[in-house]
C-alpha cells in the first residue's frame, strides 16, 4: 500500500491483514482525493476508524494542515504510529486510541476541531448489523450536533454498496456518492435548512 499523491507520493505504508481492517484500495483513495481536490490543502482532518492511517496520511501528503487519528485497536495504532514516523509527519498528527463512538467525551478532540474533512471508515461487519449501522448513522449526525464538522466541511464515509441509509441522517446530506469495486464512498455535508 502506497501514498498516491503529494509530497510523500510513492511512500510505502504498513498494512495489517485482518477481517476488521480493510485499508482503502489505492484506486478508492485516488477517487476520494480526486473529488476532494483542493479541499485537502490546509485542512484540519479527523480520521475515525483510522486503521493504519492511509486516508489521513494521504491527506497530509496532499497538503492537509493536521490530522487527528482515532482507532481502538492497539495493533492498528502501533502500525499507524510506524507509518506516521516513516512519513516524518509526527508534528502534524495526533493519535487517540479509543472507540470512535466515544469521541464526544474527549476534550482534546473538541479542542482540536472543528474539522474540514472527517473520514469515517468503519469495519464492514459493524455496518452489516442493523444496530451497528444505526450507531454509525447516529455518530455521523453527532459530528454536526457537537460542532466537530466545520460549516463547509465534508464527511467522507466508506461502506459496502447498498448499506448506507442516507434518509436516516438528520444533520447530513449527500453531495456525491461513488462506487469503486466493492466500496461505496459518500461525500456528506451539513443539511441546508430552510430559512
Regions picked out by a protein language model, each given a short descriptive name:
Residues 1-195:
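Class I S-adenosyl-L-methionine-dependent methyltransferase catalytic core
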